[in-house]
Amino acid sequence: MEIGLREWLIVIGIIVIAGILFDGWRRMRGGKGKLKFRLDRSLSNLPDDEGSAELLGPPRVLDTHKEPQLDEHDLPSVSMPAREPRESSSSKRGKRGGEPHQGDLNLDLDLDSGPSFSSRDDDFPVEESKSASHSDKDQPQAEEVLVISVICRDAAGFKGPALLQNILESGLRFGEMDIFHRHESMAGNGEVLFSMANAVKPGVFDLDDIDHFSTPAVSFFLGLPGPRHPKQAFDVMVAAARKLSQELNGELKDDQRSVLTAQTIEHYRQRIVEFERRALTQKR
C-alpha cells in the first residue's frame, strides 16, 4: 500500500504535536524545580531572629550563678566548704575569724639565717557556748610555715607611710600582736589567710609613730594548718609580696634568705599539696 502525501502530513503533524507536548511537559517540570528552588532561597533569606523564633521557640531565662573566685583582693567565704573543726564535727565557725595566735617571733634581720616562727593556728570562734570553752592549748602548733621576706634595696629601708599605704592596698589590716593580717575580705572580715611582721625584733609595728617608722625588711608568713584554702591564700600572699617589692624597691627572699624564684614558689606550692595529702591520710 502506497503512502500518499496526505498520510505523510498526518504522520508529520502527529510527530510535531508530540514534540510540542513533550517540550511543554519538560518545561513544566523545569518550572516546578525553579519554583521550589526560589522558595528555598526565600526561606534562607529570612531574618535570623524570625527563623530562630519559629524553629527554636522563645528563649528561656535561666538563673545564673557565679562561682566565687579567688583573686588577690578577696577570697570566697560563703560558698566554699568549711574546713572541718578539730574539736568536733558538729561545731560551726563564726562569720568573723580570729587571728592566729603566734608565739615568740624571731624575725631579726640576720642575713646569715632566716627568721624562725613559732605559730599557733586557732579555730575561728563559734557562737555556741560549748565551743567557747576550748582554750588555746587545745590547738596544735603550725607544722609548717611558708615565709616570703621582702628586703629593701635602699639603705634607709621601707618608710612607714609608704609601707602602710602599700599593704593596705593589698588588703592587710593591722590586728593582733601589733602586726598585719590578710583576711578573706579586704574589709578585714573572715578567717586570716596570712600575716606580715616586721623582720626586726620584736617584729611589731607602731601605728602611733608610723610617720617616723622605717624597717629594712618585712616578712609575710602562712602557717599550715591554717586557712581553709591554703593554695589560694598562698597565691594572694605572693601577689602582696610582689606588689610591695615592685613598688617600694624591694627584693623577694625565701625562708632561707635566698632569692625567691619561680622554682621556689612552685616548691612552696608542692609543700602545701603534700601537707594536704598527709592531713587527708591522717583523717582516714
Curated annotation (Swiss-Prot):
Instruction: Name the source's superkingdom.
Output: Bacteria
Q: List residues in topological domain: Periplasmic.
A: 1
Q: Does the keyword Metal-binding apply?
A: no
The biological processes this protein is annotated with in GO are: division septum assembly; FtsZ-dependent cytokinesis
User: Which residues lie in Basic and acidic residues bias regions?
Assistant: 62-75, 83-102, 119-140
Membrane topology summary: Single-pass type I membrane protein
Asked whether the UniProt record includes Zinc among its keywords, one would answer no
Entry's localization field = Cell inner membrane
Q: Name one Pfam family in it.
A: ZipA_C
Q: Which SMART domains match?
A: ZipA_C
Sequence ranges on the Cytoplasmic membrane side: 23-284
Report the transmembrane regions from the record. Answer: 2-22
Q: Which SUPFAM superfamilies match?
A: Cell-division protein ZipA, C-terminal domain (SSF64383)
Q: Which UniProt keywords apply?
A: Cell cycle, Cell division, Cell inner membrane, Cell membrane, Membrane, Transmembrane, Transmembrane helix
- Locate the region Disordered: 47-140
- Where does the UniProt entry say this protein principally localizes? membrane
Q: What GO CC terms are in its UniProt record? A: cell division site; plasma membrane
Q: What does this protein do?
A: Essential cell division protein that stabilizes the FtsZ protofilaments by cross-linking them and that serves as a cytoplasmic membrane anchor for the Z ring. Also required for the recruitment to the septal ring of downstream cell division proteins.
Q: Which family does it belong to?
A: Belongs to the ZipA family.
Assembly behavior: Interacts with FtsZ via their C-terminal domains.
Q: What is this protein called?
A: Cell division protein ZipA
Q: Which gene encodes it?
A: zipA
